[in-house]
Each structure stands twice: as C-alpha cells, then as structure tokens.
Design a protein with these regions (language model features):
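Active-site-proximal cap/lid insertion segments
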Residues: 1-147, 160-173
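C-terminal cap/loop subdomain of S1 sulfatases and analogous C-terminal strand-loop tails that border
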Residues: 106-112, 151-154, 159-211
Length: 211
C-alpha cells in the first residue's frame, strides 16, 4: 500500500531496527565504483532514490532505517488484510473450494548496493513471495526448494481447477508459457516438476542501464 495507518508504524520503533549486515557501502561489485558522474552513468532511478534518502536524513543509516520501517509497516498492513480475506472465506463456508495465492510482481532492493528500487537482477529484487493454499492438495507449512516463476501461476490454476481448452490466442499463436506447480504443492520434496531448474527474470538494457 502507498498509505499505511500510523498504528503499523508504531509496531516498528526505528531505534529497534537493525540493518542487514553489509547493507551500507557495498559497491565493490557494481559499476558505480567506476561511473563517471559527468556522463550520467550513475543516474539510475534506484541510485537516485538512494541519494535523495541520504540527503533527506543526512546520512545512509537513518534514511535506510526510516525506509525499512515504512516497508515493514506496509507488509504488516497487507498481512492483516490477507487475514481478513481468509477469515471471510472460512466464515462463509468457502474454505474447501477456494484457492488462495499470495505473491508479488517483484521484490525490492532495500539500500543494498546503494540501490533503492526494483528492476535489478539481485535477489532482493528478483525474488518474490509465493504462498499457495490449494484445498485438498497443498499441505500447510510445506516448502519447496524448486525455483518457480510468476508465469507458472496460470498453468497451475488451470490444472487445479481442471479446466480444459487451448491457451493460444489464435491458430498462429503459441501456448502460454509456464508449468503447473501442482506436483510441488502435493509433495514439495518429490522433485516431480516438468519445468526448468531455474527461474527466468529479465532486466531491460539501455544506454544508462546496460550494466
């Protein structure tokens, strides 16, 4: 959410927050150490946001802590909203035939590498939450080590709902990409997975971000 009630901020006193190890001044493996300020090569949005945060708070640490506090407040608010949805599903007798998926379209770099945005290939940005409750199939609290992608959600829903049909838009088109995660939901450790061993993520390239 863009706006979060103060009560969620109050759950995370800024003086109690600890930054992850190595979050500050960790630029050795980035292009910034050799960027030329005169050619705008360091003017990526994520770096620009980080610099603005530094300027607003006087230094990196208090700025990142304030940002982290707001991020945690947002996560807590969403968590409560998800709980409200689950309660409604259960109270209305829909728990046995309702699939619930909690995910996101991207992660977020929280100041690592001097970057404060999305759209990077670093894990903090490329990795997302993926929680699926499929009645009669998934088991609570189980995890899989198999990487999956957002493009696997639609094939999974088709499979779980026993839907039939052609996923091509027209005769000239190709079937939708992605693979059903049903085997992983049924037994996360089975290794029964038709998809690739890795997950695909992309980062656009251009004159200012071809690094």
């Amino acid at each position: 959410p863009i706006h979060v009630p103060q009560e969620y901020f109050d759950r995370f006193p800024v003086d109690k927050l600890l930054l992850p190890a190595g979050i500050l001044n960790d630029l050795d493996d980035t292009y910034l150490k050799s960027a030329d300020p005169s050619d705008g090569s360091g003017d990526d949005k994520g770096y620009r946001y980080y610099k603005l945060l530094e300027e607003s708070y006087g230094s990196s640490e208090p700025g990142i802590k304030a940002f982290l506090r707001a991020y945690l407040a947002g996560v807590a608010a969403v968590d409560d909203c998800i709980g409200t949805v689950i309660d409604a599903v259960e109270e209305n007798g829909l728990a046995d035939n309702t699939i619930i998926i909690v995910t996101s379209d991207h992660g977020w770099d929280m100041g690592q590498k001097g970057y404060l945005f999305k759209n990077t290939l670093w894990e903090d940005s490329a990795r997302i939450p993926m929680i699926i409750r499929a009645p009669g199939i998934s088991q609570a609290g189980q995890r899989t080590q198999q990487p999956v992608s957002l493009i696997d959600i639609y094939p999974t829903l088709i499979d779980l709902c026993n839907l039939q049909g052609d996923t091509r838009k027209n005769a000239q088109g190709a079937p939708l990409d992605g693979f059903s995660m049903r085997p992983l939901l049924a037994d996360p450790s089975s290794g029964n997975w038709d998809g690739p061993e890795g997950a695909l993520t992309m980062r656009f390239a251009g004159p200012k971000n071809n690094h």
